[in-house]
Design a protein with these regions (language model features):
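Outer-membrane beta-barrel porins/channels
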Residues: 1-299
């Protein structure tokens, strides 16, 4: 039997936030996020010929997930040091989580043309987005910057009752396992180096060079064992003009998941590459910000 899996779709996020500085160098903020999107998954199962030489009967399954959810966040930030030479910032955020109740439409087809529906139904799944606590610190000098974050996610809480079972392999190599949601902890660290942001002669010295590392666990356990996952990142920030903090950001990421228990349980070890490009617009305080939205005046 040959299996072929395919999938496509996307989830879009819109976020609105509001910040307030009640005391000098101390800020609080709130935010609301709305998610929506559709994800389609298809599998094709093609067995060996059973109705005659060269003739096959294939089975096709299609799942469509329609997602919609809203959740909120609060956060605080304290600039312990803030001057022209150094910045030291501490921060924390709390995410309230929310209910993610996807509408799932499942269809099963059989036959070479996949036009005979043998089973089809629509259900609503119950899945809770986790509450999340994140704390971090950031330190910056003229050339160097380093940041550290710790993130805790409460996946196990209200999702603890959702357990699944599965098998891998066959015959003597067949392995049964139980899958359950679990709380996760992740540590992140990144460093940035900018040789000289104000260098007028050497363009590459104005670039920012970045590297990072992330280590944690997946949000599901297999027979009580957690899937470890980690990633390494690298990137550059290309300033839009000399002395500017606004930049075009380019980054790559390589990650692995499940390498610690995949072989023992007969699971697939996952590895991936990501490429990202973005734009950072910096419009800070008047004394050190960039005047993107002010009309120039000439004497």
């Amino acid at each position: 039997i040959q299996y072929n899996y395919q999938g496509e779709g996307d989830v879009t996020e819109v976020k609105v936030g509001l910040g307030w500085e009640p005391f000098k160098n101390f800020s609080v903020g709130i935010a609301a996020q709305y998610y929506w999107g559709d994800i389609d998954r298809t599998f094709v199962m093609t067995p060996t010929a059973i109705t005659g030489e060269g003739t096959f009967t294939s089975t096709v399954g299609q799942d469509n997930y329609s997602i919609s959810s809203i959740k909120g966040q609060v956060g605080v930030q304290w600039n312990a040091i803030l001057n022209a030479k150094r910045i030291l910032t501490f921060g924390a955020t709390y995410d309230f989580g929310g209910d993610l109740n996807p509408e799932v439409t499942k269809k099963l087809y059989i036959g070479d043309l996949y036009n005979t529906v043998v089973k089809g139904d629509t259900t609503h799944l119950k899945l809770v987005l986790p509450r999340q606590l994140a704390v971090g610190a950031y330190y910056q000098t003229g050339r160097w910057a380093v940041g550290v974050d710790y993130v805790f996610q409460n996946w196990g809480g209200r999702n603890s009752g959702y357990e699944m079972t599965g098998t891998s392999g066959s015959g003597e190599n067949k392995t049964e396992y139980k899958v359950a949601y679990t709380n996760t902890s992740t540590i992140k660290m990144g460093v940035e180096y900018t040789p000289n942001r104000y260098d007028a002669r050497h363009f590459l010295k104005r670039w920012s060079y970045r590297a990072g590392f992330r280590y944690g666990a997946y949000n599901q356990t297999f027979n009580g064992d957690k899937l470890a996952q980690y990633a390494v990142t690298a990137g550059i920030g290309i300033p839009v003009r000399r002395g500017a903090f606004s930049a075009i950001d380019i980054g790559v990421e390589y990650g692995r998941r499940g390498y610690n228990i995949a072989d023992r349980l007969g699971l697939v070890r996952q590895q991936y590459f990501k490429f990202a490009i973005g734009f950072t617009l910096f419009a800070g305080q008047m004394e050190n910000g960039e005047y993107w939205f002010m009309r120039s005046k000439f004497d």
